[in-house]
Each structure stands twice: as structure tokens, then as C-alpha cells.
């Protein structure tokens, strides 16, 4: 109450000239952010449909030296609330069925629907995908994010990473007298990661067929502390049945949070579901994805800086009773 009173006093103490100056500064900052996002949006539209069907002519040495590194996007120009209501009407675009989904727009140079098998639900700023990508270069990884500005940030980040890595790879090939030409791991350029604005709580089966995914990540989801908000948590009995549907037998659900109450909630619901079985601590210690998940996300790095705790639980998808008959 006292803080609010102090704030009111501070505002009332401002002169009309100071208030006018402050308003102009805020307006200039907002205009600058919008212009930055509009510029990135134009780049995004062009890059999204760049599909090379024929080998490009070899660049001359002079053109290679003029290739410039694309600037990575800046978070301050993508302001967004920390969380979004999953039950709101966000006017999202989604396919009627997985068969009608055109994945080639997201993975223009590495498209194969059978390989879309890793999903980061609520991917945030994309840190996990960017670390997982090189570890699974033959698999397609999709991040689902409901917030508009955050999704645009990740799109722009992936576009910049792809362009920059291709420049680096071309330079390495020229220095080594030419590449192998067989598309080995040395040619990796983040073509297997992509982000999509979507609501996993509503439309996940619209994107994936039964048993398509091998891994699902739920990293630092919204805890929804209030009792009446618990129905909006990303792990519930109903949603777990949907996750089990799109997850193949033996697939893994990865969860991590810095909120112990949410961790206990997720563990309770996963333990009670007949199609999931918790993996041991020994398994977690040996799995490279757990290590990446623990340290790669922006939220996880913030928890580390604040010396907070991280709670991990991983579950294996069990065979369905019908499949055992």
C-alpha cells in the first residue's frame, strides 16, 4: 500500500513538461520496437519460402569474403507477457489433420514427415531446440509456443542461425579444398529445428499422428499457482492421454521446473497414468537430453543465476493394453 502511495506521489510531483517528455520517450521506444519487428517480419517472409531445388553456382572468392553474418534478434524488441491463457481464443491456424499439415514450409531443406519426432511444448525463446538440434541432426524438432512475440523471436533466431551457419560451413569447405558433398554432420546448419505458434493443450493431435513422437519436453511450464487455475496446467490426466497418443511406445516425456509444488503435481499425475512409467535417477544421469534440458533453456539459466532448485522427472511411454493382446 505504501509503495503505491509513493508511486502516486512521484507521478503527481512530475511537471507537465516532464510528463510530456516521458510520454514522447515511450512513444519513440514503441515505434523503434515496431519498426525492428516489421523489418524482421519481412526477412522472415522471404526466408520461410527459400527452397533450393538446384545446386547454386559456386561463389567466387571475392563474393565469399563479402558474405555478412546475420544479426541475431534482440529480446528487448519482442516484449511479451510471461504467460498466456491457453483457454483464450487466440485465432490460431492449425491443420484439420496431420496429413494436411505442410511441414516443408518449416523445414525447407530437410523435410520428411516421418522424422518429425521431437517436440518442445512451450518452447519459450528456443534455447533447448538450438542445443538439441546438433545432437539429433537426422531428426526434425518442433517447438510449439502460444505467445506471438516469442514465436516471432524464435523464428528470427532460427533464420539467423541457419544463414550464419551456412556461411561458416561454406568457408570451411573452401579452406579444406571442397566438402564431402554427402551431407554429413559437418554440414549442420539448424535446418532440422523450427517453431510454430500453437496451443498444445487444444490442437496437438491436429499436428501429429499416433505414435509419431519419440520425445516430448515440458520445460519450466506456467505453474498456475492458484487452485482454480490448476486446470490450465500443461500436465493433467486428460492431456496425458493425448500425449500418450502421439508418443510412440518407449518414447520419453521430459519435465523440469523450479517450482516444487508443480513438480509434485506432474509426478503425481504421471505416476497415476497407466501408460507412463517413471525412469530411474541413474537413467536421468546418463541421458544427454536431461543434461541439455537442465542447462540450455533461458529459464533454466535464470534459475541457475538465482541459485534456485530444478526438479526433473522423466517418464517412458508404456505399451497400450490393446497392443499387448
From Swiss-Prot:
Name by which UniProt lists this protein: tRNA (guanine-N(7)-)-methyltransferase
Any one of the GO BP annotations: RNA (guanine-N7)-methylation
SS bond partners: none
PANTHER family membership: 3-DEOXY-D-MANNO-OCTULOSONIC-ACID TRANSFERASE/TRNA GUANINE-N 7 - -METHYLTRANSFERASE (PTHR23417), TRNA (GUANINE-N(7)-)-METHYLTRANSFERASE (PTHR23417:SF16)
Gene designation per UniProt: TRM8
Keywords: Methyltransferase, Nucleus, RNA-binding, S-adenosyl-L-methionine, Transferase, tRNA processing, tRNA-binding
Compartment(s) of residence: Nucleus
Pfam families membership: Methyltransf_4
Amino acid at each position: 500500500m505504501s509503495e503505491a502511495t509513493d508511486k502516486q506521489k512521484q507521478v503527481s510531483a512530475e511537471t507537465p513538461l516532464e510528463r510530456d517528455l516521458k510520454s514522447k520517450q515511450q512513444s519513440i521506444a514503441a515505434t523503434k520496437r515496431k519498426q525492428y519487428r516489421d523489418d524482421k517480419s519481412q526477412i522472415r517472409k522471404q526466408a520461410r519460402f527459400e527452397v533450393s531445388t538446384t545446386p547454386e553456382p559456386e561463389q567466387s572468392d571475392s563474393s565469399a569474403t563479402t558474405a555478412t553474418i546475420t544479426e541475431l534478434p534482440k529480446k528487448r524488441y519482442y516484449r511479451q507477457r510471461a504467460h498466456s491463457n491457453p483457454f483464450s481464443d487466440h485465432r490460431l491456424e492449425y491443420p484439420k489433420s496431420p496429413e494436411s499439415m505442410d511441414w516443408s514450409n518449416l523445414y525447407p531443406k530437410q523435410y520428411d514427415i516421418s522424422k518429425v519426432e521431437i517436440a518442445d511444448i512451450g518452447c519459450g525463446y528456443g534455447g533447448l531446440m538450438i542445443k538439441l538440434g546438433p545432437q539429433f541432426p537426422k531428426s526434425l524438432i518442433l517447438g510449439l509456443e502460444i505467445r506471438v512475440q516469442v514465436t516471432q523471436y524464435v523464428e528470427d533466431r532460427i533464420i539467423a542461425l541457419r544463414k550464419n551457419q551456412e556461411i561458416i560451413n561454406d568457408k570451411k569447405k573452401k579452406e579444406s579444398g571442397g566438402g564431402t558433398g554427402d551431407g554429413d554432420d559437418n554440414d549442420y546448419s539448424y535446418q532440422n529445428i523450427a517453431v510454430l505458434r500453437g496451443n498444445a493443450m487444444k490442437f496437438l493431435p491436429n499436428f501429429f499422428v499416433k505414435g509419431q513422437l519419440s520425445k516430448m519436453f515440458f520445460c519450466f511450464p506456467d505453474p498456475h499457482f492458484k487452485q482454480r487455475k490448476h486446470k490450465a496446467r500443461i500436465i493433467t490426466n486428460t492431456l496425458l492421454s493425448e500425449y500418450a497418443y502421439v508418443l510412440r511406445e518407449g518414447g520419453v516425456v521430459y519435465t523440469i521446473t523450479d517450482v516444487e509444488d508443480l513438480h509434485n503435481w506432474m509426478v503425481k499425475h504421471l505416476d497415476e497414468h497407466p501408460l507412463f512409467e517413471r525412469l530411474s535417477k541413474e537413467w536421468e544421469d546418463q541421458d544427454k537430453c536431461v543434461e541439455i534440458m537442465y542447462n540450455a533453456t533461458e529459464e533454466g539459466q535464470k534459475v541457475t543465476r538465482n541459485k534456485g532448485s530444478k526438479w526433473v522427472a522423466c517418464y517412458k511411454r508404456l505399451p497400450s493394453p490393446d497392443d499387448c493382446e
